Amino acid sequence: MQADELYGVRKIRLISEKTAIDINSKSIIIAIDVELAPNWKTYWRSPGQFGLPLEFRIIESTNVLNITPLWPAPRRFVNEKFPFLSMIGYEKRLVLPLILELTQKGRGAKVKLDVSLGICRNMCASVDKRIEINLPTGSPKATKEAKLIAISMARV
């Protein structure tokens, strides 16, 4: 068991739909991939009365003009004992697509984010993680994670 799994998170990472940035590209789709341990949930951008939404801050990045999240449709979870404590979010996995706008068209990018998210099971906790991805300039090919991103994009 990884240390993060003690807090309900199996992994948090940045993934990309493409292996590289095309020389004509002004943007690329990347995603924050959050895999949760069984029975844990995380929150949507508007999590309900008591939740903590996933938030990120761009740090130490190169060729990054802007990052815009595209939230997949969430689900409402109702607490059977305390129905007023319902939450809006995701279970098992959240792949949050991000539109990465480049400062310089067709140049590689290094993206580093500080991510914070609330997770709940019988108790709730805040998890913080620094994640990064390097995207070189080149001939882009689909990554093995491209399908995960496409599935989430279809739910936006």
What positions do the PLM features span?
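Extracellular/lumen-exposed scaffold segments
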Residues: 1-156
